[in-house]
Amino acid sequence: MTDPMTLPYRPNVGIALFNRDGKLFIARRTDLPGDVWQCPQGGIDEGETPQVAALREMGEEIGTQNARILAERSGWLSYDLPSDLIGKALGGRFRGQTQKWFVMGYEGQDSDIRLDLQDPPEFDAWEWVDPQAVLNRNLGFKKALYAELIPELAALFQAAARDWVRTSRA
């Protein structure tokens, strides 16, 4: 049997999608028990840049790409799957994921968001929430990751937001 710690990390993008009011998009997963919420994320296909992957994943998971990349978190952030998921999740080929995170500004209408375009859908509900309120949700095994990440992503959004809000409303 393969030692799980020798498995590689899957390259992945994470999307911190903010609306013009500074609220963060989160969605409830359909494949995990216990009302687990997260930001959109997904794998990077071979030959694809992280930026292209982020927009593609957004379109696949929430039905719209109507957003602008405002900032990119420096570096990659890796996490291990819980031991009971290694060998099962992610096709059983990865020990976890290494993520490049993007801060995006949502330029569409709420009615553009569609969770029913995948079969089966990855999410069944979504909300715009204050970034710090995300940490009060059930984030499953990603709780520690989000505790580290959310303050940094919110700060990146705040740094880019003034110019984006002004130009996106013009």
Curated annotation (Swiss-Prot):
Pfam annotation, one family: NUDIX
TM annotation in the entry: none
Record carries keyword Flavoprotein: no
Family under the similarity heading: Belongs to the Nudix hydrolase family. RppH subfamily.
NCBIfam families membership: PRK00714.1-5 (NF001938)
Enzyme class: hydrolase
Function: Accelerates the degradation of transcripts by removing pyrophosphate from the 5'-end of triphosphorylated RNA, leading to a more labile monophosphorylated state that can stimulate subsequent ribonuclease cleavage.
Keyword RNA-binding: no
Entry-linked CDD domains: NUDIX_Ap4A_hydrolase_plant_like
Motif Nudix box, residue range(s) on this chain: 42-63
Keywords attached to this entry: Hydrolase
Enzyme Commission number(s) from the entry: 3.6.1.-
Name by which UniProt lists this protein: RNA pyrophosphohydrolase
HAMAP family named in the record: Nudix_RppH
Entry's Gene Ontology BP terms: nucleoside phosphate metabolic process; ribose phosphate metabolic process
Span of domain Nudix hydrolase: 8-151
Cofactor(s) listed in the protein's UniProt record: a divalent metal cation
GO molecular function list: bis(5'-adenosyl)-pentaphosphatase activity; guanosine-3',5'-bis(diphosphate) 3'-diphosphatase activity
